[in-house]
Amino acid sequence: MGEYYKNKLLLRPSVYSDNIQKIKLVAYEYGKLHAKYPLSVIGIMKTIDDKFVLCHRYNSFLFSEIAFTKDKRRKIRLFKKYSKYMSNIERDILSYKLSLPNNYNTNHIDIIFPGGKIKDLESITNCLVREIKEELNIDSSYLAICKNCFVYGSIYDRLIDKDFEVIALYVETDLTSRQILNRFIPNREIKGISFIDARDINKDYLYTNVIKYIINAVRTSASNS
């Protein structure tokens, strides 16, 4: 968790989970925020027409884990147990490579927020601006990143049994959802994008809970200033 505890706590920690992930979120005042080790930064980005940007990961985390692990028994176990959490194309590829039957027809998509890993000597906000440009083709001139607060997220992936850490920042853009769609070019990280209307974030999904939590953090930080 680094030294984020030195920043003032804004909200009580909250834990959300589904069949794939378990996420613990803690909101802090921004203050001095520096990355002391490799981690990822994500942006909870709201459009000018009150929608939040959702990214469709090019390869699911599960597919990437099976494809790159050198442990053959692990490959087989993960495929047999969790292959319904992959796209049809991913299952077809691994079914062929592992000589295992494909027993599902569910076209699962990993929904994530724009962002990525911090590079050496890169600030947290610069990392997010770079990632949004790379993934969504949106320049920094269209972005306003909230620097009053941040959310630390500890993510446990139930499928691949691994932990990840992220810093989430709230971002507003003066582009509409249609303009973002028109700018978007599929890339090696993100194959597509979609949006959820701000009026629909009370639906009980993992990503809507993340959105609601950071909105609450932004409102709390504004009321404290």
Swiss-Prot record:
Keywords: Hydrolase, Magnesium, Manganese, Metal-binding
Motif (Nudix box): 116-137
Gene Ontology molecular function, alphabetical: hydrolase activity; metal ion binding
E.C. number: 3.1.3.-
Residues at which Mg(2+) binds: E122, D157
Conditions for induction: Expressed in the late phase of the viral replicative cycle.
List of catalytic residues: E131 (nucleophile)
Chain ranges of the Nudix hydrolase domain: 35-218
Organism domain of life: Viruses
SUPFAM superfamilies according to UniProt: Nudix (SSF55811)
Residue numbers binding Mn(2+): E135
Claim: Magnesium is one of the keywords in the record: yes
Transmembrane portions of the chain: none
InterPro entries: NUDIX_hydrolase-like_dom_sf (IPR015797), NUDIX_hydrolase_CS (IPR020084), NUDIX_hydrolase_dom (IPR000086), Vaccinia_D10_decapping (IPR003301)
Group of enzyme by EC: hydrolase
Cofactor(s) listed: Mg(2+); Mn(2+)
Family the entry assigns: Belongs to the Nudix hydrolase family.
Function statement: Decapping enzyme required for the removal of the 5'-end m7GpppN cap tethered to viral and host mRNAs to allow their decay in cells. May therefore accelerate viral and cellular mRNA turnover to eliminate competing host mRNAs and allow stage-specific synthesis of viral proteins. Acceleration of the turnover of cellular transcripts may even promote the shutoff of host protein synthesis.
Protein known as: mRNA-decapping protein D10
Species: Fowlpox virus (strain NVSL)
